[in-house]
């Protein structure tokens, strides 16, 4: 283990220790041990595993600080892993010289506006733990190709743009757990393009990740290309993301217009069709995602989903979404079950919360507990709104005290609204309709609901829009 003081480092936060630290990496045994102190550097420290062999960076239990006063990453780890996670694809030189680099026990502070904390390139089984990275543009950036990455027990805090960035990276088998990822000005965790699969984000506190939080040194105008910040943001408009679990996190906590607690963006994909491909089959670049057991709230939107499929949203507490709790457009195969929404305690509070689905199919809402959802207006929209959707179901939900309407279908086909309670219990009700079906809607079923408290009409569905039966209408 190479002691940096023996290679000429000063560690007083004033002297430029770049040469001494790099000399330690190049001439030492591959393990960079940072004694207690503050090490100022002006260019990246490169741990090139292809040249130096197996390596690591270790601090003294969090007492070791690196100040990055130049552009680029404070620590750059380079490997040459060219395969996947499958053992048969891992080349001998990876196991011999490059596997399992670890970085732990250090703080990295950015002084340059283009500084990055840690960059990983073509690594295999890298583990970053017990680190604090702050005031960098990006805290941790993965590029090109990486496999089996673990980030644990760390703080990515108050960075100018992003906490953890998966940057156009071919990346599988990623676990992020036990971390505090907060006060980053664009996103807490962002996947941008690339080919990302098998991502688990579990047991973290992910908060205040937008330009309005924490006294951003980059003005919101300079971040105009980033729509409002997000705690978790998957952008697969030029790539793919799938097989994702987001579970047991706190994901909140300040509103920026255009922002979201979780934003997932895909695009439709055209694939060669086999003879037996169903005509209704659609493909997209963001799919197979599980969002379970989280607390999400205090943002413009809770979840913002675009061109996403096969998503399960269960057992979450979702609250204080100033625009919408869930917005989904051009999505398919979405299950929203067993969640609670809202709790706008006072009529004097700003209007907020609601669910809206546009141009979607195969959506299921079930066993939801909602109260005082405000989405829509006196003219259009409801607490739960479907527009141009088909083959959707809403069942066994409590939609209590909605501001304008309980549920609205517009231009919808073959949707089923069954066994829900939609009532306005206020002394002076404001709900105009419990259920309204309009436009070119057809072949929809409204059955077995308990409806009450509407100021205009409990069910407004005319013509061939719906079959109505066995509903309890409370006068």
Each model region followed by its residue ranges:
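Extracellular beta-strand/beta-solenoid scaffold signature
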Residues: 42-47, 69-94, 111-120, 134-142, ...
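N-terminal extracellular ligand-recognition/capping segment immediately after the signal peptide
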Residues: 8, 18, 26-72, 80, ...
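Right-handed parallel beta-helix/beta-solenoid
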Residues: 1-20
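Leucine-rich solenoid repeat scaffolds
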Residues: 431-475
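Parallel beta-helix/beta-solenoid
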Residues: 29, 49-52, 56-60, 70, 77-136, 202, 245-251, ...
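Glycine-rich, low-complexity segments
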Residues: 1-5, 414, 468, 474
């Amino acid at each position: 283990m190479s002691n940096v003081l023996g290679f000429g480092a000063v560690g007083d936060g004033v002297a430029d220790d770049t040469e001494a630290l790099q000399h330690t990496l190049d001439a030492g045994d591959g393990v960079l041990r940072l004694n207690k102190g503050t090490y100022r550097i002006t260019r990246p420290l490169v741990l090139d595993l292809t040249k130096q062999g197996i390596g690591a960076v270790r601090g003294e239990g969090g007492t070791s600080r690196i100040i990055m006063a130049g552009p680029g990453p404070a620590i750059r780890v380079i490997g040459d892993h060219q395969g996947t996670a499958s053992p048969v694809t891992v080349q001998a030189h990876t196991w011999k010289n490059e596997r399992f680099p670890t970085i732990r026990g250090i703080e990295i502070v950015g002084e340059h506006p283009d500084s990055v904390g840690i960059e990983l390139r073509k690594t295999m089984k890298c583990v970053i733990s017990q680190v604090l990275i702050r005031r960098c543009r990006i805290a941790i950036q993965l590029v090109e190709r990486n496999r089996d990455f673990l980030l644990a027990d760390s703080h990515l805090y108050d960075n100018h743009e992003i906490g953890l960035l998966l940057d156009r990276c071919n990346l599988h088998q990623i676990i992020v757990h036990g971390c505090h990822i907060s006060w980053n000005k664009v996103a807490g965790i962002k996947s941008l393009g690339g080919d990302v699969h098998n991502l688990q984000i579990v047991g973290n506190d992910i908060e205040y990740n937008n330009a309005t939080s924490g006294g951003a040194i980059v003005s919101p105008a300079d971040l105009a290309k980033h729509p409002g910040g997000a705690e978790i943001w998957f952008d697969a408009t030029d790539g793919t993301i799938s097989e994702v679990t987001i579970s047991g996190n706190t994901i909140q906590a300040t509103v920026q217009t255009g922002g979201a607690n979780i934003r997932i963006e895909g695009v439709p994909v055209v694939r060669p069709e086999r003879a037996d491909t169903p005509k209704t089959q659609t493909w997209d670049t963001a799919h197979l995602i599980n969002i379970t057991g989280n607390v999400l709230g205090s943002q413009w939107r809770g979840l913002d989903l675009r061109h996403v499929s096969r998503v399960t949203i269960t057992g979450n507490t979702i609250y204080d979404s100033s625009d919408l709790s869930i917005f989904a457009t051009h999505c398919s195969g979405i299950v929203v079950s067993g969640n609670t929404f809202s709790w706008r305690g006072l009529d004097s509070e700003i209007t907020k919360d609601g669910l809206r689905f546009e141009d979607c199919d195969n959506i299921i809402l079930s066993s939801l507990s909602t109260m005082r959802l405000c989405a829509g207006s006196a003219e259009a929209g409801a607490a739960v709104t479907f527009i141009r959707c088909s083959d959707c179901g809403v069942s066994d939900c409590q939609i209590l005290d909605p501001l304008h309407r309980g549920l609205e279908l517009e231009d919808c086909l073959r949707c089923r609204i069954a066994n829900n309670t939609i009532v306005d219990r206020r002394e002076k009700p404001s709900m105009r309709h419990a259920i309204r079906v309009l436009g070119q809607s057809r072949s929809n079923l409204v059955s077995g609901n308990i409806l009450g408290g509407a100021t205009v009409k409990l069910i407004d569905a005319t013509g061939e829009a719906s079959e109505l039966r066995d509903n309890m209408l409370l006068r």
